[in-house]
Amino acid sequence: MEKSYDCFAEYGLHGTGIRALAKHCGCTSNMLYTYFENLDDLIIQSTEYCMTKVEDDFMAKAPTDVEDLWRFIDEIPYWTAKKHGKKYRLMYQVYTHPKYREYGQKFFKGVDERYTEYAKSLEGKLGIPYEKITPLIFILIRACVHYALFEDEFYLKSQIEVLKETLELFVMKYNPKFKEATK
């Protein structure tokens, strides 16, 4: 699945047929049809699989302690753009296509749930309610993906600046002891 997704990411969704995919994967077209009902099934399954791996890569870098939070916010947009930019572009191409939109909605519902769980894990460490942390995670993710798609430095920096300032305000409101400890 990963090889087929990489092939789509490299050559485009519409310019890549089953023969090109098979060649890229080192197999025959018939072999692909052994695993997938049709090209749409291959696109749907490989997109979900690869974007889950991208999310896992991203979360593996996510901070587990407060001291690492600011570094993570500064570095992750550039890292993920370099490592996953083509995959994000293809994901948006697939999940915004009318034929596959429902699969995108399903995937992002799962993303919402996973990031909410991550926010809950940060709640005790930051002292900020997870209901406040969750939207900040979404802002960071959106800024990262937008940067990976368009390399729009202005958009990225303005989002990151607001994110950091909001985090500082929440820390002062909910956990002033942490703010003093990091000075």
Model-found features: residue ranges?
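Helix-turn-helix
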Residues: 3, 7-41, 45
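C-terminal effector-binding regulatory domain of bacterial HTH transcription factors
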Residues: 174-183
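Short secondary-structure transition hinges
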Residues: 75-117, 150
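Solvent-exposed, amphipathic alpha-helical segments
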Residues: 3-10, 53, 57, 61, ...
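Short, basic, alpha-helical segments at the C-terminal edge of helix-turn-helix-like DNA-binding modules
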Residues: 18, 47-55
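Hydrophobic alpha-helical segments that form the core
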Residues: 128-150, 158-169
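Amphipathic alpha-helical packing segments from all-alpha helical-bundle domains
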Residues: 55, 99-127, 131-135, 161
